[in-house]
């Protein structure tokens, strides 16, 4: 019954992702933004505490970082943009409003691909300031304002996801891209990358639902999947009973592995947005944008394409290698050193694919110096000198001890010979190339 219901219904998931930028100072003041693990309320000033008369001054570097992110997500960068006040009341928001962006964000209309062909549309990428942090101790709640005013980029996607697996892949790819740009460590556990999925259920090929549920308090990729899967199941069970889920904000309880009601979800008009009067609108010249674009490094998707085209390595291997920029850079440096040292001595194999295999399969650890890695790689790549007499003696023993396998091979089971190759390689302890073993075995078997 449940599978039939699922056949008729389809989850609709959009994402709001917040990225804390790794600038030295906060978004609108000169306080240090390096708040993690610091003494509470030690990185504050009248601006980030919202004291009367304090005026905000935008952080130029943070805006440049946002433009890099937007470019990496193939967004259109607007020529003009402005900041707005987003009003709501919460203890961690000292001003009673958050400086954010509403109707004129810095960038809009982007798109990225997950896997090879699934497109995810990016609605907007805009700038705002982070809030303080509430710390609950017993029957008291304390506030640490060190985080208040830290530059925060919000990335909003269209509701293009229908399952938690695609969400997880998208987030992992986004985290990798952010780290390549070197604008944030994008660490979910530290809170420098946060996810709020918006989930609803609609009939397949039907119109969008007239509600959506936002999930907060998700701080790892593992819990992303669990929170979304639980919420999809919860909403479907309600719909099966004829109940439309409430439009609300829910939290995720990691211990219970469940979502729970936090508050009724607000509409945009509830925030009473209006332009920030203390910050003039921004105008971005073509030269200014081009200078920022020129500073963007090669990103993972382009690196994957280059590895496949230039190094002739498999897509899956190229994808794995580019998940970590340090590993990817090490791979390229290792290729250069190994090829230089071999000096075309090894022509019969794809050296790049072999080195990729050494790294991915952890046959040679990348914790080694490049020199030591190169020495080990050359040893593995170089043809082995084979003692033919020793090899033939081992082959005779293997044939003698595996009469049934030999019989099967002679009856036409071609794969049987590979078992014999494996036995010979095992007994000779790797002192011969597999292709030499195969050749000598075929001679012996006739």
What do these predicted regions represent?
Residues 28, 79-89, 93, 97, ...:
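Aromatic-residue hotspot detector
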Residues 1-6, 65, 95-116, 152-168:
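Short, charge-rich amphipathic segments
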Residues 39-44, 48-51, 119-121, 126-167:
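Glycine-rich, flexible beta-strand/loop modules in the N-terminal catalytic cores of phosphate-handling
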Residues 5-15, 19, 35, 143-160, ...:
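Charged, compositionally biased, marginally structured helical/coil segments
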Residues 23-31, 133-136, 205-208:
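Short acidic, Gly/Pro-enriched loop/turn segments at secondary-structure junctions
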């Amino acid at each position: 019954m449940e599978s039939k219901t699922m056949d008729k219904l389809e989850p609709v998931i959009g994402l709001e992702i917040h990225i804390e930028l790794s600038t030295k100072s906060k978004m609108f003041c000169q306080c240090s933004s390096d708040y993690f693990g610091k003494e509470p309320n030690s990185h504050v000033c009248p601006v980030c505490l919202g004291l009367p008369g304090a005026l905000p001054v935008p952080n130029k570097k943070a805006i440049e970082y946002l433009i890099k992110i937007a470019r990496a997500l193939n967004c259109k960068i607007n020529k003009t943009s402005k900041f707005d006040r987003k009003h709501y009341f919460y203890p961690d928001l000292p001003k009673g409003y958050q400086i954010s962006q509403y109707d004129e964000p810095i960038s809009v209309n982007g798109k990225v691909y997950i896997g090879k062909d699934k497109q995810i549309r990016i609605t907007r990428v805009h700038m705002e300031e982070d809030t303080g942090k509430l710390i609950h101790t017993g029957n008291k709640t304390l506030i640490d304002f060190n985080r208040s005013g830290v530059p925060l980029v919000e990335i909003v996607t269209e509701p293009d996801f229908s399952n938690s697996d695609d969400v997880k892949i998208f987030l992992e790819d986004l985290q990798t891209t952010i780290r390549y740009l070197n604008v944030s460590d994008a660490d979910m556990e530290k809170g420098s990358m946060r996810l709020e999925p918006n989930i609803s259920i609609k009939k397949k090929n039907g119109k969008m639902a007239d509600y959506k549920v936002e999930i907060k308090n998700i701080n790892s990729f593992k819990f992303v999947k669990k929170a979304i899967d639980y919420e999809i199941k919860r909403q479907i069970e309600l719909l099966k009973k004829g109940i439309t889920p409430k439009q609300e904000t829910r939290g995720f309880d990691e211990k219970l592995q469940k979502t729970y009601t936090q508050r009724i979800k607000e509409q945009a008009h509830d925030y009473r947005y209006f332009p920030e009067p203390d910050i003039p609108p921004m105008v971005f010249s073509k030269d200014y944008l081009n200078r920022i674009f020129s500073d963007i490094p090669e990103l993972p998707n382009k690196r994957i394409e280059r590895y496949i085209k230039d190094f002739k390595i498999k897509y899956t291997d190229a994808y794995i290698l580019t998940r970590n920029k340090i590993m990817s850079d090490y791979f390229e440096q290792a290729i250069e050193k190994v090829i230089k040292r071999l000096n075309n001595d090894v022509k019969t194999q794809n050296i790049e694919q072999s080195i990729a295999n050494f790294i991915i399969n952890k046959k040679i650890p990348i914790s080694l110096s490049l020199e030591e890695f190169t020495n080990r790689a050359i040893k593995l790549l170089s043809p082995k000198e084979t003692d033919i007499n020793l090899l033939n003696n081992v082959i005779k023993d293997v044939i003698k001890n595996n009469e049934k396998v030999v019989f099967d091979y002679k009856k036409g089971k071609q794969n049987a010979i590979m078992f014999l190759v494996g036995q010979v390689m095992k007994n000779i302890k790797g002192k011969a190339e597999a292709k030499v073993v195969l050749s000598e075995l075929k001679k012996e078997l006739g």
